[in-house]
């Protein structure tokens, strides 16, 4: 639970990007993650002609977007007239007269701000997609463990905790936490470059 109340009044960025929901009217997009999913959701909604107000607790929109993609996204946002609010957290949501009231909070000034919208989309990253990892772990030679010292010293992973193990298994990328593609590829490369 990322905010006080009104969780049932919002949808996730993935609900939007996978077309599980169709939104119209004024949309508040709250992006606590600052990565591609939030910016991509804003672009997707703008392409559909929606009126989007993007809010983030960070000092800038898309704080984890790289320098190549950032200018293109911001240009699109400005050209579309998208409203952007930084340094504000989503505190709560409530329904009133058929609309949703989003209560925001600025940590810098300790002041609240309320926005009235038709829909709220929240991007908080993802929980680890670790079900396959845990299912396979018991049959792995290393029981899913990574030798951190060997990893740091660029040595092969040789842990053998299961003599009946059939393979080595390592937990990287979204199996650990919300990651972008570059981070997951970097983790895989670092781990596998000495095999």
Task: List each model region and its residues.
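Short beta-strand segments that buttress and anchor functional surface loops
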Residues: 103-105
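Rossmann-like dinucleotide/flavin-binding elements
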Residues: 1-67, 107-119, 123-195
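Helical element adjacent to the flavin cofactor pocket in flavoenzyme catalytic cores
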Residues: 73-84
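A conserved short coil-to-beta-strand element within the FAD-binding core of flavoproteins
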Residues: 1, 86-101
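Residues that act as N-cap/strand-start positions at coil-to-secondary-structure junctions
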Residues: 78, 87, 107-109
